[in-house]
Every structure is written in C-alpha cells, then in structure tokens.
Amino acid sequence: MVALAFQGHLNPMLKFAKHLARTNLHFTLATTEQARDLLSSTADEPHRPVDLAFFSDGLPKDDPRDPDTLAKSLKKDGAKNLSKIIEEKRFDCIISVPFTPWVPAVAAAHNIPCAILWIQACGAFSVYYRYYMKTNPFPDLEDLNQTVELPALPLLEVRDLPSLMLPSQGANVNTLMAEFADCLKDVKWVLVNSFYELESEIIESMSDLKPIIPIGPLVSPFLLGNDEEKTLDMWKVDDYCMEWLDKQARSSVVYISFGSILKSLENQVETIATALKNRGVPFLWVIRPKEKGENVQVLQEMVKEGKGVVTEWGQQEKILSHMAISCFITHCGWNSTIETVVTGVPVVAYPTWIDQPLDARLLVDVFGIGVRMKNDAIDGELKVAEVERCIEAVTEGPAAADMRRRATELKHAARSAMSPGGSSAQNLDSFISDIPIT
C-alpha cells in the first residue's frame, strides 16, 4: 500500500487494511519520510493493521515542498526509493492512492498487479475520466458559469467540477492529471471508498468505460457496529471535547470542521461565530491553527460562557457519532462526507477546492442530506445571515425532517453494504480472490 503523508491519504488506507484483517493477507504501508515523525506516537499501536515502511521523496528535510516540486521529485526519486522497498520483499499486489501516477509504473516494472484506492467520490472519478479520456464533451473550463451535462450526475456548472481540472491550477497540475489518466492502463482495479447504494447510477454509468469497485465506507469498525478501534490520527486528539459533548442535550450541537489541510480565515471564523451566537446554539469547532480563533472576541466570549468548545483536532468519527451533534458545517472533503453519511448527520456544505464543490452537489442534490452555504455574489464574503439560514434549514426548517430521515436511511445502507453479504463486502471478497498469490 502506497500513500503520501497526508491524513486524507493515510486514514482510508489504514481502514481498508483493517477491514481486510480477517483475511490471510499481510499489509505494508509505504509512505514518505515526512510521515515518520507524525506517526511516531502511534507507530507502536498494537492494533495497527499494517507494517510501516518509509521512503525518501528525494527532497531535503527542510524543503518547503511546494506541490510542483514535490510531484517532480516523487516521480524521479520517490519511484526509485519505493522500488527499493519492493525489491526487499515480494509483494503480490500494490495499492496506491490517486494522483501518484508513477506508482502503477513502478508496479508494472516489477510485474505486480496494481490497484488504485480512489479516495474521492465515484462521481469525481467519473468526471475526471470522461474529461481526460475525452469520452464526453466539456465546455470551455475558463468560464465558471458554463454548464456541463454528464451521465448520472445533476446538471453541473464548471465551478462545480474538481478544481484540479481547471486551467487556473496551472500547467503542472494539468500535466499531473493527464499523467494520472494515462497511468490507468497499468491499473487492474479501481477500488472506491464509497458504496453501491450511495452512488449506484454513477457506478453503473462507468461499467463500460473503466469499471469502478465500491468497497466502502472505509471507516473505523465501531461506526459499523463492530469492535472499537483507534484511527491513526496525525494530530493529538483533544479528549475534553468528548467530555463536553456528553453534557449537551441530544441533537443540539453544531459541529464545524474544515479538514486537516485547509486553515481557517479569521473573517470567516468571526462570521460563523456571530451566526452561532445569534442562533443561540452550542457548538464544537475544530480550528487549525487554533490561533485563528483566539483573536475573534465573539467566539472567545462564547467559549468562556461554556456555550462552545474550540479544539485544534478532534477524532471526527467519534464526534459525528455522538448523540449531541445536530449538524455538521463541513468543507465537503470525501473522507468527511463518507463519515457524515455513515453517522447519519445532516450537513451545511461549504466547499472550497479540489473535489469539494462536486461533493457538495452530491450531498445536497443527490444524497439529499444538506444545504449549500454560499459566499455573497457581490463581494465574495460569507455573510452572517447566510450562515444562520443554513443552520436553521438543516435543524428546524421545513425540509429538516426529510434531511434527517434521508441521512438515517443512508446510515443504515452504509452498514448493510459492509455487513456479510452486503454489496461492498462482496466486492472486497471478489478483489481478494482476484489477487494472484505467489
């Protein structure tokens, strides 16, 4: 298993290995040296489902690692260093995260079958594939207002497409994406952290192009009613927030988190905090870095009054599954999207980049479990009234009951998919049986 040193890459891989722990397969997770220190506190975790191996990305330790430089170095030096790990031990299959097009080439060079663990939506894979393989017409991507019609997806605007496709991302990103599409010729399986019942029409629409195999939701087993296990978080977990949640009323707390990479902006923090105060609702807010919230007076006042908690990191699966949570204000990253689906929590969708805008469309218009929060059309700023509107819509508005009902339906469907005989469980069994064991 090959992943880069990002929480959004590592956690799905580890959970994938955990779900296959019942088999006689042995897993090694190879990741870059940058993850060594981050994972040091959990490296001896007795329940860890994989061995860890680290390889150099070819850059000095103090290099800032801007995306373009990192991508070039991984392709040149990372590939050679990964090959050394592979040569030390015979592997029967290599599973890689997306957007590392050099990994399938390394697998092919060693005559090892390769799978991609797609950690975005099936819908996102469909969009990327149809664009880069030129199977469907697309408008001029310079014009964000142009519409895009694709099978099994709602009518999209260019602004809804994954941002990595857009010309504004630059030539290097577009080259990387084209290389990823090309590397699919060396990929035998496209495994997706989703489940058939969630994206059935999209999955069916890809069956004659590049079949995708849903094997999720890849979440900690306790969310599926099984034994409770720790996740391999790269930030220290703040247990106080769970103790605080235990003291709150059922379905009363607004949970806010914009992921492990995006940093909160002070003006957005103040806007959302003011809306929370006006609504009079308790909140649990993950802000990174935490200092971004320390200068926001209205937020600090509410924390001092015991009306909310601010933490730099919390174990999201446990937070979302807590009975006190009423809704989730989210950036709509796919890991967060899957976790909110499995826990049955309605969302306020506030996407920013990559696949998040498309995930927001899925959450609101396909899954039916949330509303979209938008910046002002004139000045581009988030307004207090808009935040209040969205919180009301998902907690007590006329459509709130339907969202909650639909969220509960998807929660049960997710559990069924991973249960013995379920759609994802069957796909996992088929994948395992298809691996040529030497």
Curated annotation (Swiss-Prot):
Its EC number is 2.4.1.-. It comes from the Eukaryota. Keywords: Glycosyltransferase, Transferase. The keyword Glycosyltransferase applies. The keyword ATP-binding does not apply. Belongs to the UDP-glycosyltransferase family. This is UDP-glycosyltransferase 84B2. CDD domains: GT1_Gtf-like. InterPro entries: UDP_glucos_trans, UDP_glycos_trans_CS. It is an enzyme of class 2 (transferase). One of its GO terms (molecular function) is UDP-glucosyltransferase activity. UDP-alpha-D-glucose binds at residues 260, 314-316, 331-339, 353-356. The gene is UGT84B2.
